[in-house]
Each structure stands twice: as C-alpha cells, then as structure tokens.
C-alpha cells in the first residue's frame, strides 16, 4: 500500500455507499480510486472525500483501472472555501480543469503546487476573476498549451508566469476582459466536454 498527499478532484457516488474518486497527487499525478463504503464508514474516510480537500490517502496502487482507497486522513480541508460561494466555485472549477486536462498517472509537480497554492489562497477570501486567470494561464503553460501573449492588453498574463503568488498581478478592466476572451477560447479548445463547474462559476459573475 502507498500513502500520498493528494488534492481531491471530482467525486462520484457509486451504488448505495461507495464512491469513485479522482485524486491529484504529487508523486503519481492524477489517479482514479474506488472507495468502498465511503459514504458509510466514518472511521476509514471521516467524511473527508470532498472536492478541493487536501488529504493524506492510503491506497493500493494499480497501473490500470481503479486503485483501491483504503484510508483517508485530513490534511487540509479548507472549510472556509465552503463559506464563500466565490471561493467554492473557483476551487471546484480549478479541480475540474485539472481532472479534464491532465493525463492519468503522469506526475505534474508544478501543477500540484499551483492547485495547492490556489486552494490555500482562497482560504479566508473570495475568489476573484484575476485569481481565475492567474490559475488558467499557469495551468496552460505547465501543460505545454501556453498561448501567444503578444499585445499590451495581455501583458498581465505574461507577468503571471513570472511569479508563483496569487494576488500579486493587477489587471485593469480592459486587461481582464482581454485575458478572459483569450483564455476562455484556449481552454474550450482543449476540453473534450463542457465543464459543469463553469456554469456555477459564471453565474456568480
């Protein structure tokens, strides 16, 4: 069995009490696991299997198919994310982006740190449009999908690639609009399906 630090991505109920869980790990990248009786066993899972939670997970790793999740312990559950809808929406969107755009079983340590940093940043504050665009451009860059940033209005996006800290780069309204047009188009082009969390995020404005 293997113990790793993970970020929980989308989670699906299976049958009456089981769950199929997508996890993003530092060591193994994105994995899919089967958590038997996850909705019934608080001793083994403690109700921690929720999207955007940082978890210490013990599981039996399989090269193909679903790994078996044996035990989950809380690492950082970020309860504040669920107290502000803007933060919750952005964290769910970021997790779904990682789930959709990353290959299974391929370590991406820079992206793991980016996602972890976003979740920590959103603790205690509302997620902003600038936070969203910072995450998106860095995610695309890490995955090798970096778009051309060749106009003055896109300069803040270039600056986002030079710092690892959310909240450092300021956007004017025009710059934020230009960044949104570009990134929305680029991300849609790499996604095989519409993102469910995007509707929730955009409904909040």
Where are the regions that the model predicts?
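Single conserved hydrophobic/aromatic residue that forms the stacking wall/gate
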Residues: 1-7
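Non-catalytic alpha-helical scaffolds and adjoining flexible linkers that form interface surfaces
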Residues: 8-19, 24-205
